Amino acid sequence: MKIYYIGVLRNSDDKTLELSSVKDLSQFGFFERNSVAQFMSFFSETVAGRTSAGQRQSVEEGNYVGHVYARPEGICGVLITDKEYPVRPAYTLLNKVLDEYLVAHPPIQWKDVTESDDSLKLKELDIYIAKYQDPSQADAIMRVQQELDETKITLHKTIENVLQRGEKLDNLVDKSESLSAASRMFYKQAKKTNSCCIVM
């Protein structure tokens, strides 16, 4: 999973303008990087210009996906990723970026500009392109699911470790003095019920 580009573009006029962007070109060869960077900007301007206010869309191009979110204020966020990057974290990140951009740069600052200006950059984009390479950083639900999976793995390992010492759960149940005869019988019946069925 990889993020290659995060951009904020003005799409309220006829000419779409890239206001702030960051690119991760580390996976491309040195001589390819300039062309790839130009193509990412061109792709972003094209899809941003064709995305209506309030609309979200994901556009596939080769091995890449451009996730686009246009806001009613006249700006649009574009995230270019590989195909494996999940959609929900992509839009969560775009929403965060656009919210922060509008706080840092209200529309009055960029509505009438005709070319990119360094004063309109969002410095946090450099941090975000590194941090959100892991999509669980952008998506709380995904992060909780990952933590639950890790807990489940730990629980399975703990049970396996007890059984690896040469003790079987059946033997422990039989030897246990704290279990009543009824509890032992319940355990054995439950084990029989959960075992594979025999076809006669």
UniProtKB/Swiss-Prot annotation:
Query: What species does this protein belong to?
Result: Kluyveromyces lactis (strain ATCC 8585 / CBS 2359 / DSM 70799 / NBRC 1267 / NRRL Y-1140 / WM37) (Yeast)
Lipid moiety-binding region for S-farnesyl cysteine? 197
Q: What is its main location?
A: membrane
- UniProt name for this protein: Synaptobrevin homolog YKT6
Which Gene3D superfamilies does the entry link to?
A: 1.20.5.110, Longin domain
**Which UniProt keyword terms apply here?**
Cell membrane, Coiled coil, Lipoprotein, Membrane, Methylation, Palmitate, Prenylation
- GO MF: SNAP receptor activity
Q: Which PROSITE patterns match?
A: LONGIN, SYNAPTOBREVIN, V_SNARE
| Entry-annotated residues carrying Cysteine methyl ester | 197
Q: Can you name a GO cellular component term? A: Golgi apparatus
Q: Which residues form the propeptide?
A: 198-200
Lipid moiety (S-palmitoyl cysteine) attached at 196
Q: Which Pfam families match?
A: Longin, Synaptobrevin
